[in-house]
Amino acid sequence: MSVADDDLGSLQGHIRRTLRSIHNLPYFRYTRGPTERADMSRALKEFIYRYLYFVISNSGENLPTLFNAHPKQKLSNPELTVFPDSLEDAVDIDKITSQQTIPFYKIDESRIGDVHKHTGRNCGRKFKIGEPLYRCHECGCDDTCVLCIHCFNPKDHVNHHVCTDICTEFTSGICDCGDEEAWNSPLHCKAEEQENDISEDPATNADIKEEDVWNDSVNIALVELVLAEVFDYFIDVFNQNIEPLPTIQKDITIKLREMTQQGKMYERAQFLNDLKYENDYMFDGTTTAKTSPSNSPEASPSLAKIDPENYTVIIYNDEYHNYSQATTALRQGVPDNVHIDLLTSRIDGEGRAMLKCSQDLSSVLGGFFAVQTNGLSATLTSWSEYLHQETCKYIILWITHCLNIPNSSFQTTFRNMMGKTLCSEYLNATECRDMTPVVEKYFSNKFDKNDPYRYIDLSILADGNQIPLGHHKILPESSTHSLSPLINDVETPTSRTYSNTRLQHILYFDNRYWKRLRKDIQNVIIPTLASSNLYKPIFCQQVVEIFNHITRSVAYMDREPQLTAIRECVVQLFTCPTNAKNIFENQSFLDIVWSIIDIFKEFCKVEGGVLIWQRVQKSNLTKSYSISFKQGLYTVETLLSKVHDPNIPLRPKEIISLLTLCKLFNGAWKIKRKEGEHVLHEDQNFISYLEYTTSIYSIIQTAEKVSEKSKDSIDSKLFLNAIRIISSFLGNRSLTYKLIYDSHEVIKFSVSHERVAFMNPLQTMLSFLIEKVSLKDAYEALEDCSDFLKISDFSLRSVVLCSQIDVGFWVRNGMSVLHQASYYKNNPELGSYSRDIHLNQLAILWERDDIPRIIYNILDRWELLDWFTGEVDYQHTVYEDKISFIIQQFIAFIYQILTERQYFKTFSSLKDRRMDQIKNSIIYNLYMKPLSYSKLLRSVPDYLTEDTTEFDEALEEVSVFVEPKGLADNGVFKLKASLYAKVDPLKLLNLENEFESSATIIKSHLAKDKDEIAKVVLIPQVSIKQLDKDALNLGAFTRNTVFAKVVYKLLQVCLDMEDSTFLNELLHLVHGIFRDDELINGKDSIPEAYLSKPICNLLLSIANAKSDVFSESIVRKADYLLEKMIMKKPNELFESLIASFGNQYVNDYKDKKLRQGVNLQETEKERKRRLAKKHQARLLAKFNNQQTKFMKEHESEFDEQDNDVDMVGEKVYESEDFTCALCQDSSSTDFFVIPAYHDHSPIFRPGNIFNPNEFMPMWDGFYNDDEKQAYIDDDVLEALKENGSCGSRKVFVSCNHHIHHNCFKRYVQKKRFSSNAFICPLCQTFSNCTLPLCQTSKANTGLSLDMFLESELSLDTLSRLFKPFTEENYRTINSIFSLMISQCQGFDKAVRKRANFSHKDVSLILSVHWANTISMLEIASRLEKPYSISFFRSREQKYKTLKNILVCIMLFTFVIGKPSMEFEPYPQQPDTVWNQNQLFQYIVRSALFSPVSLRQTVTEALTTFSRQFLRDFLQGLSDAEQVTKLYAKASKIGDVLKVSEQMLFALRTISDVRMEGLDSESIIYDLAYTFLLKSLLPTIRRCLVFIKVLHELVKDSENETLVINGHEVEEELEFEDTAEFVNKALKMITEKESLVDLLTTQESIVSHPYLENIPYEYCGIIKLIDLSKYLNTYVTQSKEIKLREERSQHMKNADNRLDFKICLTCGVKVHLRADRHEMTKHLNKNCFKPFGAFLMPNSSEVCLHLTQPPSNIFISAPYLNSHGEVGRNAMRRGDLTTLNLKRYEHLNRLWINNEIPGYISRVMGDEFRVTILSNGFLFAFNREPRPRRIPPTDEDDEDMEEGEDGFFTEGNDEMDVDDETGQAANLFGVGAEGIAGGGVRDFFQFFENFRNTLQPQGNGDDDAPQNPPPILQFLGPQFDGATIIRNTNPRNLDEDDSDDNDDSDEREIW
């Protein structure tokens, strides 16, 4: 059936009737219990979805274009129809409830990508939890511009700074792709590109035709009709839902309680009847209460008939009850669901929940009243109204579902019609029920008919269901000329026309929705409309119309104000330049600002005749006021940042509005100095003032940025008008004056005795404005300000206040004032302190007619005037003992007044100004010490680093980059040496650092050597370049007689008191004054005031002072200043000095200076001659230094060699010295043990003799093939799993620290370790066994290396190295070994269980593992150059370990006995390869346990292997084509060696192959020869390692080199040629002369199981996986890098998430799991089990994970950005991070040598001890790994947040991890975050906690599955399937994961 145009009306009626009468359906009509309610919800959802989809699809005709048949439906019952057949079928609720349908509206996963295409519109896709948000610094207009993973196209952002964030519940947003205003350059949407690729496929044409039906006018009309009806229905339902409104909710409860208590049942029934939802389809069956008299109590005594039926009690979420409070309150309400915790969780998650429901009203009333006694919000709601509200919820969910259908045509139509219906007028307003009469009837006390705001103040609609009048304010022209001390006169309109659209109604009802519905509505409406180019401006305009309503609602009438829609609206709408332009042009900005002012005004008071904001003092549990304040200020700042015309904020109405807002916080927070006792409780009220005033400063700075960017286009008259308004307001305040010297009026005020404020935003604003115009124009604008001191004095008070606090004068006010002062003074983002300096500079310039008055006013404000005038002496001022420190601050202030001139400079361009500021900031941040890029960037104010291009340019100009040297440090930037001279330690930029320490650092860089540091004189940085001409005389006040007197008195104080506290600064100030005078009056000028006041006399006294009085630097500075003064005016100066000190004193001084090379009375000609000689001497010294340097560099060439001592002949027979690491005793007779880590190794791989990739590549050092990425074949994956489980593949790793056995036992007992899990007491390396040792000595044994090679090598022979044992020794070592065997389970538990196993056979197992350890060393050395001898060099510790293991084996057989050679620990089996290195295993076994020479053993082994290899290789090539292809492939990789005639003959003797079709018959032998050499190489190298270990046992001296057959092995083998290496090595280790000789031998082959079917071992490079060259690739192109994946099958949206890890062992992408155990599960199931390394691309970290005991640490990923940074900082700004091979090689070295466990334990330190202890039986159920990050070398590396963690408790080696993942959250107070209380000792108090655990308890984690009884938690997962992880929020994972975490429902996705 098709719907024609004339049928739309009837369809509209059907929709309206169906929705509004849904309560009449029998299935929904009556109340039901909690379980039935859940079934009803599912049925209701399916009913809404089926019906609306059927209607919107033209009676189901177009459903096939939207959905496919659900696969379950076809499988379960093919008879069931896929889609509804008719309207009747669609609304057949019985069919739904009887489960005869399966939802057809499942979205086709194969087409899910289509939903991301957004041709012709913005994307607007809402980010999901776990998905990345991409920001491009170059492309985005600001930080709010983001792209989703589907739209982000890496091609658009090559070489750009692209950074990512992971979407969480708190960092969300929508994709801005397609929004041209959001991007600086056109972007090419990736989703659209994919669509274009698909559209070229002919198979898609049919789908495109099907989609076109949604462009049909009939279908468009249908969509519009359906959406209009559902939105109208939604509005109608929530218009009548006034019960949850905070304005009347309590009144309803009170009224119901009173009616109940007073027995007014009829009135109560009537009241409830009036409140409940009604429409035209209600009938009397739901209630019997009517207005007829027959229902009165008198007519019918039966109350049951009066009470309405079917009512519910609904509890709403709020933000001021915690979990326990809510649970207690719910219990009092006696809910019908016994699971209170589930109810509480639902309230928190959903936002509301039904407490109970009943047909009988009296059954629910008690609970309704009871739950509210504890303050919970509850409503008494009729069942029908609840049903309609649930219907509305599912309608919104249905719309959400529609927005995700992968049909682009449908999306376009649906979204357009959604915008149209929402933005259209709500025409049904008059037809629907008006709640105004109900409110007026029952709440008349709140409903004043004469109040025009009666509707908005109750948050209800006006008459006729219209948007009510808001509290708007209009600023008239008459109020734009000046700023009122209170509030400027404004007009309040009595009426206003609103659009009255559906959108406005839905937003107006925002405070009525519950939490989940509120979020869903916002997620449906805001992204959809904000992404529409057509409806976005309409949406914005309609939001602005009711901005006043929403803002007031948030402040006064919202239960959950943090959920307000206005926040997201501001971000999505007001950040759009077009919208912002419209807002300003329509003057809506004024309405927004006055709406915000209106709310602030509610909390203002009048102080000193001025209206200022005061802290909220009324109870506000929801924090709605704070949220409203912050949101309002953020809105203003956001709009100002998007101003297109910089004149707009300066227009009269706008500037008055902004100034009114700023004025409310001007000096709002005042503090007063406390005296007497210290405060017990510090005042924290300042926080709110600080917070909001900071926002005001941000608004001011935003306005300043806008004006700065478009300075040339601003009307200067607007600037001057603004200056006039502010100065008039600030300058006309009534202040008290006092008279100084009967002639100078200064302002009377005492900072230390009166209330004073830090922050004065208006003063800062005035400073900004004055900076933008010339001083002359600004001065003329001050026409209404007669005394600028009235303005500047408030800034001066702030400066003095900060200084008094800094010196400890306000100590009794507590620490909080110190933090406030620091925040205000040292915060460059505020810029307020420097602006205070600026205003005081202006006072000096503009009040220049009476400079003494200014100086007196400054002295008085600093409370130094009484001292200056002589009324009090120096030691009895108000500051008492802190006077010296306050003067130190005073001098710094005066110096800054004199030298800080940045606000008076004029630059040719904005960039020049910014570059000057950036360079200065960098210089002052780098001079103290070099900094990493991130630290430096954080140190520089944000407004200077918005464009990092400019920052980088300035950084390059002023600094030198120092590359990182270590493996964990960052690169740093160091200030250029030439720039240290430009650093002034008394400048504002150095405010945070002390003068003297800063000066010392600067001098140390300027001085040539340490002795010269004190002699360096720092030059004050004073400049008049680019200065406004009216500011040239800024320093004139310092040349005034009054100020000279101040300086004189201060110098005199220093001399009199012999106090140098402030003398350094004072002399620097004097120096600055002289420098400024020189710039203004010429180089030979000295201020007259400093001549009339004999400053020179005081300088001479300081210069000649004793060394214990003043420091050398002070004396040098005074001497320098005096010298400069004398040079300029010698006669006057000497006359003054002689008058004071006499001739002799002055002559002595002259002589001293002459000895220093300074003639104070020399002529100009003499001075030039002296300087020329000095220059000549300097050049000569320079040549001498160069000569000395040359000699040092070539010292070795000039030294003679005769002094060398030859030590070769000296023999050393003594054994190695053993010292116990614990007791430090080396003389004890106790046996020693060494700690060792004994576990599986991941390095053994099977080989393929026909794979040229294995044999042809050169061993040329560590490498990374970024083209290969991370693909690994299945054989490798299988080998990794086998390596982690097969007992024959274990190795040893040891730190080789010797410990007495008895000391070790005591250590283990004391630390509560076990012998198979402990950390080395010296280096904290994790160990799981000990190896007993004793000293060996070659003395008197006759043993030598040649003997081992030529005659006999066995353990019997080697045991002669032991000294004779006593019987006691035997017993002791025997017991040690017995204990070792027991604790280590024979070093292989499976072998130990064998029936014929005896303790003696342990030596066989140890020998296998020792051979593996040698193999590990050899494999690791393949990565280093030169490969031929790399295994010899830089491996002292490894050889020491090998020697110790061998000694242990020797000692074992010597004490316990020889093993049975009939016993085979790893017997040969047809399908089992125990050891890939079987050939070397044979060599070791024969060498140690057979009385034959080593050469004979090696010869037999290599001969057998070579023959087997050649036969298998040559016979395995079947035809010429195969050979040719193999040869070509091999030649492409490397050089195939040519066989010689001799070698060809030798090869043919073994296998003579004749093959037709070959170009050359020799190529098959060339291949065989080349591959054979590479196959022999590993075993030959291992034999050499074996020999070197033997050499270590019997060498004569420490430095003796390895010599075989008279050849020094390392020198002999050090070359690259493989063939020559093999031949020479074979000559050394076998009985043959070469490989040819080996192959042609006629000796019989030894028969041994190990030499039969020898497995081939991989002989290539073994390392961690190949990584992408750039780490960013994993983030920006994660979908293109096709890695194997491992995740839960329940995880949705996995392809779009960045919270994954990449296993560096096997290359699998491991997705985050809900239980956070993804790493452990991966290692145990699919990879190498014991340990692993995981790359976390999103955070640029590597997680090193140990399975047993479960532990994590985080280290920086081996990627560096261009600034040499690693880790999180490397990618923070989107920098390109490149793989650093050196660091990756270091990580690989840890992995390949089995050193990751030890590295983890060393990093964790003593905390690893807790990890070991908590891994026992008792602790197992409460263990999570301890995530720890490496402490960075750069101390400023930030964001050390806790990372991912895994968990595994191993009961036995075969135990499946799935059986061990259950645990209780925080059962013993120990979790992933560490030990409670932070100390390791606290862990051992867990027993107390455990006793409490057996008590029943509630679960405080609302989002996690609920706790079972604690004892069940303790007993593990077999008693409880829910796994609870502390601090895991399921909402931060995929939502589907939180439903089901049981591993039985999980599988690995590959």
Curated annotation (Swiss-Prot):
A zinc finger (RING-type) spans 1220-1324. Changing R1169L: Impairs interaction with UBC2, but does not affect degradation of N-end rule substrates. It comes from the Eukaryota. Zn(2+) 3 binds at C136, C139, H157, H160. Interacts with UBC2. Interacts with RPN2, RPT1 and RPT6 from the 26S proteasome. Zn(2+) 4 binds at H161, D952, H1763, D1775. Residues 1165-1200 are annotated as: UBC2-binding region (U2BR). Residues 678-681 are annotated as: Ubiquitin-binding loop. Residues 1333-1665 are annotated as: Cap helical domain (CHD). Zn(2+) 5 binds at C1220, C1223, H1300, C1303. Changing H1175A: In DHHY mutant; abolished E3 ubiquitin protein ligase activity. In FQFH mutant; strongly reduced N-end rule-dependent protein degradation. Changing C1320S: No effect on interaction with UBC2, but inhibits degradation of N-end rule substrates. Keywords: Metal-binding, Phosphoprotein, Transferase, Ubl conjugation pathway, Zinc, Zinc-finger. A zinc finger (UBR-type) spans 121-194. Changing F1190A: In FQFH mutant; strongly reduced N-end rule-dependent protein degradation. This is E3 ubiquitin-protein ligase UBR1. Residues 1826-1846, 1893-1950 are annotated as: Disordered. Pathway: Protein modification; protein ubiquitination. Residues 1833-1846, 1934-1950 have a biased composition (Acidic residues). GO terms for molecular function: proteasome regulatory particle binding; ubiquitin protein ligase activity; ubiquitin-protein transferase activity; zinc ion binding. Ubiquitin ligase protein which is a component of the N-end rule pathway. Recognizes and binds to proteins bearing specific N-terminal residues that are destabilizing according to the N-end rule, leading to their ubiquitination and subsequent degradation. Recognizes both type-1 and type-2 N-degrons, containing positively charged amino acids (Arg, Lys and His) and bulky and hydrophobic amino acids, respectively. It catalyses: S-ubiquitinyl-[E2 ubiquitin-conjugating enzyme]-L-cysteine + [acceptor protein]-L-lysine = [E2 ubiquitin-conjugating enzyme]-L-cysteine + N(6)-ubiquitinyl-[acceptor protein]-L-lysine. Belongs to the E3 ubiquitin-protein ligase UBR1-like family. One of its GO terms (biological process) is regulation of dipeptide transport.
